[in-house]
Amino acid sequence: MKLGCFFSLIDYSGILHNHEKNLIFYFFAVLIMRIFDAHTHLNQEDLFPNRKEHLEAFATVGGHGLVNIWANRQYNTNGLTISNGSRASFPDLWIKASLGIHPCDVGNAIGNVEEEITLIKQQIETNRDLVVAIWECWIDLHYPEGASFLGLQRDFFRAQCELAREFNLPIVIHSRDAFSETLEILREFKDLVIYFHCWGYWPDEIKVLKSEFNQLFIGFTGNISYPKAEEIRASLRETNLSQILLETDAPYLSPQGFRGQINSPAKVSIVGKFAAETLGISEEKLWAQVEENFWRLYRG
């Protein structure tokens, strides 16, 4: 039944006010939309202890699929624990994991490249049905210390791209204040499916990526709602609908109205609202396209 027909039935006496109709419309719209968080961190200590409650909240707002992404030994293990442990409790949720190495751990010299890649490879082989991407393929020069181990970041980046190639998995990219350095490496791996998470550059960089990479996805998170983030909203408008993914990056980057609070996967519904407004399309149309994109990225 279309929502318009529904309203004609429940409001035959004209007793509903406009704001009540809007609330009811939004409630039922959420019920018929399937939403997806392409990048979250339930495996992190801020969220992991209460992961069941966060998953329940996600399901309540129409959540259907999410991918837990992090990149050190403990968080990789936690991500696999969530995927395994949620099968019985949340049979209708598609919950998978991404494995990799975070550059902070690279800087802490937790191990050499070969040792860490071997460990990740073993985890993938043991949990092949749960692992859907390689992360963290990362070049980050936002803080001064990033430049001090740029060479090691590059080594791990290339090694993880090779791992993605070996297992035919997409790579999830974090790039901050390092677009040219990131692009230099990605040009060596144009055969891979590339997901730029938490977009933080300008529309011109979107144009460069679109012109060079055929298998490209761009992730937008709660920062598209920030008043001063016009360059990110402009980047969203520059991105093809077939390339857009939505994410929370929880527990980080809560959308406007919730800033300063711990983020959670359920708030991806709010990201979708802001994104649809920015694009000038309905939330239903956006989420239908995001669902298609989500499956193309993570299921191939």
Where do the PLM segments sit?
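Short, low-complexity, intrinsically disordered N-terminal modules
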Residues: I15-L16
